[in-house]
Amino acid sequence: MQTSPLLEALTEALRCLPGVGPKSAQRMVFHLLQRDRSGGMRLAQALTRAMSEIGHCADCRTFTEQPVCTICANPRRQQSGQICVVESPADIHAIEQTGQFAGSYFVLMGHLSPLDGIGPDDIGLGRLQERLENESIEEVILATNPTVEGEATANYIAEMCAHYGVMASRIAHGVPVGGELEMVDGTTLSHSLAGRHPIKF
């Protein structure tokens, strides 16, 4: 039982974070109060600003405090003719770290899931359709997760692209670098075999 309502409220608030249970939240609270009150104040200020000032990019729907994010505001990225469709802003960061993509993005903020009542309008496909209609898009790279929902979402968007005469491609899925075949699941191995490519000398 907590000795302070504020302690209890803060502990409960921290539990909204993924992977944080009662014990972890309590340890965080005690650490901030005992050892790092200034850090706690900075955290509170940063959270308050972020929650009130960060919105969505008007073009790609990623998180930004500006009307348009820095990637969408870059003329070179817009002129590439490529849009990479991802499920979350975190996926953009992962792809950007590779340094292999120089186009623009579109963030779904999820995936199609009829059983959960999530349809095309809920993941912003209307906005993607507008971009296909109004921009000079040559290729849409579908980088949704390799799940049942992710594949269904990719197929739906691929059909949409076909309607506008835009090429749709799917990122490759397969055996991870350094992985061993005996440890790979059957579905991943099937994708690897289907996506094999010739070795050129």
Curated annotation (Swiss-Prot):
SUPFAM superfamilies in UniProt: Recombination protein RecR
Keywords: DNA damage, DNA recombination, DNA repair, Metal-binding, Zinc, Zinc-finger
Listed InterPro entries: DNA_Rcmb_RecR, Rcmb_RecR, Rcmb_RecR_Znf, TOPRIM_dom, TOPRIM_RecR
Start and end residues, zinc fingers (C4-type): 57-72
GO BP annotation list: DNA recombination; DNA repair
UniProt GO MF annotations: DNA binding; zinc ion binding
Start and end residues of each Toprim domain: 81-176
Keyword hit for Zinc: yes
Entry-linked CDD domains: TOPRIM_recR
UniProt xrefs under PROSITE patterns: RECR, TOPRIM
Highest taxon above the source species: Bacteria
SMART domains: TOPRIM
Entry similarity comment: Belongs to the RecR family.
Function: May play a role in DNA repair. It seems to be involved in an RecBC-independent recombinational process of DNA repair. It may act with RecF and RecO.
HAMAP family xrefs: RecR
Protein name: Recombination protein RecR
Organism per entry: Sodalis glossinidius (strain morsitans)
